[in-house]
């Protein structure tokens, strides 16, 4: 929902002649976290599992205005999709995950050139988080797949952009992707600690790391690992590594500062402004999908 939305009482509250300083406009980002691939791939994930009314669509919600949401009608090429000069296979051969985030985590992927041409290959690493009953009850939103990091073959041997190292047919190379595990945590506005509310949390459950030619390939790999009966016709090219987290973890401090809710007054629902904003939720895709922002009256509190 982007555009120039004007408060119903804009003329009464805005006396500035400078457009940069005027306070007559507002915007409600009803899409929540579901922007770009995080929307399309998460809704696809839920449609495969027939949850959250993911396959049900309201008028105007699909490209053709239909009543059924279908990924193939929405996306031509997924985020991260690319065409390379050869074909490659991938295999996750090693993973060292430090869930505390105190040290860097590493995932090593063995890449083999299975084609006939020498070429480079980009390795994309994604992760799928558990979407729990707690998340559904409290409105903690999570995308079904998210990019963790990426790497390329030949990088370890290259000294400059001109010094390109290609992987020859039949050859293999290990590509190691590093990341900080706390970047995978989700922000929970309800988490209480140290007499404040709001923190990053990592819930107990199974975490699936996946590679693939783009986000859709990765999410299909995760689905096929978890629900093979539902993915009989899918042929993803990625590889999957699963690691279980036994208990919940929280991140309550960063760089010496306490983590807590600080921007809750940015939510228009915090004010009695004439309408209620509904934010998109994977708990009910069809009935929370943005259909336009209602008229809003600026209050003295704003």
Regions found by a protein language model. Name each.
Residues 1-106, 110-120, 126-128, 134-138, ...:
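Secreted, periplasmic, or luminal enzymes acting at the cell surface/secretory milieu
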């Amino acid at each position: 929902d982007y555009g120039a939305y004007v408060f119903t009482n804009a003329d009464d509250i805005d006396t500035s002649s400078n457009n940069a300083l005027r306070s007559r406009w507002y915007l409600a980002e009803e899409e929540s976290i579901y922007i770009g691939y995080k929307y399309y791939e998460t809704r696809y994930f839920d449609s495969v599992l027939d949850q959250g009314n993911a396959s049900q669509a309201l008028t105007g919600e699909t490209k053709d205005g239909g009543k059924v949401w279908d990924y193939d009608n929405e996306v031509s090429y997924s985020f991260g999709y690319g065409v390379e000069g050869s074909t490659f296979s991938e295999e996750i051969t090693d993973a060292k995950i430090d869930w505390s985030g105190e040290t860097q985590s590493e995932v090593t992927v063995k890449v083999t050139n299975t084609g006939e041409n020498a070429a480079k290959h980009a390795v994309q690493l994604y992760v799928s988080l558990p979407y729990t009953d707690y998340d559904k009850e409290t409105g903690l939103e999570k995308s079904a797949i998210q990019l963790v990091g990426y790497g390329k073959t030949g990088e370890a041997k290259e000294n400059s952009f001109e010094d390109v190292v290609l992987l020859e047919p039949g050859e293999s190379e290990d590509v190691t992707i590093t990341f900080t595990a706390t970047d995978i945590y989700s922000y929970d506005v309800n988490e209480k600690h140290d007499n404040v509310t709001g923190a990053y949390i990592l819930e107990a459950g199974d975490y699936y790391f996946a590679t693939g030619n783009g986000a859709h390939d990765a999410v299909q790999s995760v689905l096929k690992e978890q629900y093979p009966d539902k993915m009989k016709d899918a042929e993803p090219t990625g590889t999957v590594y699963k690691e279980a987290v036994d208990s919940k973890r929280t991140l309550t401090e960063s760089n010496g500062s306490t983590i807590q809710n600080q921007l809750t007054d940015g939510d228009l629902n915090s004010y009695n402004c004439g309408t209620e904003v509904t934010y998109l939720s994977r708990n009910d895709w069809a009935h929370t999908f943005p259909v336009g922002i209602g008229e809003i009256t600026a209050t003295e509190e704003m």
